[in-house]
């Protein structure tokens, strides 16, 4: 007879609980040194921006809190998406409208990913831009409900309430009149819902949210790939098959989108500058400072604070904490490698969920110092 099945990698990880109390003294010291290095590095990286070299406002958060920023953006990406949405709502085909508006505005049309996926424009035509904004608010409320009432494992009720307030502050950006046009913001809200709504025996709500994010913004694909890796590590065959099917469907849809763009492209159309800038971690950091409430703080104070949520997620443990840690660090690394400074808004894919990690940071830091103190007391 076969003995009991060995626990999967994910089962062994989740059985560990919160990871920091299990660290040896040197491990706790290493994590604290790394956190301090990240905080100092963030302050150093943002120093040029603090001196006046800040990125041009693009975010809905910027538009919400600054009239000049809103006017600047009205001449850029959001105005372009608004014109495309209006033409689609009037009955014109999406790709014809999008390429025409890109040409008229001096935007590139090659490669095909410079043209946003049509999903959001179709949704705007169906329920209106205001409808999209209200839908984003409902989705943000769903993420908050999943966090508080469904009980995020390993977090106290006090931590969940603070995290919910941070989620509400970020999700409230949907009140901006520009929110309905922002693909990255909508995808970020959907991915936040997918992160918090996941439950091992009821994963389909999170699956639907992730699928919707993927349909809105192709940059959500790494989130789904990471989830697939987690499903495989947890030996969850049905979940893994569903995610693999979703990715296959996404690839087919992306190929159809590329074909539609190629057919309508003209010889004189502009090409993108590319996405191999190797601009470093200052890009996602600049995004966090521009797109969150940290923009109201002095940059040299805000930059180190931008790192704290990562410590909170690392200390949370469980499936949610590990997934969040890998997703956020992976997104930041991808931006550091491929994004141009003007692409700092990609960080919206991590919002508002990333900010919720700030609620978990105090206990995580306390646990690290506790490990150091426990060893010291033992030696005494």
Question: Whereabouts are the PLM-identified features?
Answer:
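Transmembrane-helix motifs of polytopic, lipid-linked glycan transferases
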Residues: 122-126, 130-158
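Membrane-interface alpha helices of multi-pass inner-membrane proteins
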Residues: 191-197, 203-232, 245-248
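TM-lumen/periplasm interface segments of multi-pass membrane proteins
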Residues: 4-133
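Transmembrane-helix signature of polytopic, membrane-embedded enzymes
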Residues: 148-172, 189
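Short acidic/glycine- and proline-prone juxtamembrane loop motifs at membrane-interface regions
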Residues: 176-184
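Membrane-interface helix-loop-helix junctions at transmembrane boundaries of multi-pass membrane enzymes
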Residues: 153-158, 236-241, 309-327
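Hydrophobic, aromatic-rich transmembrane alpha-helices
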Residues: 141-147, 298-321
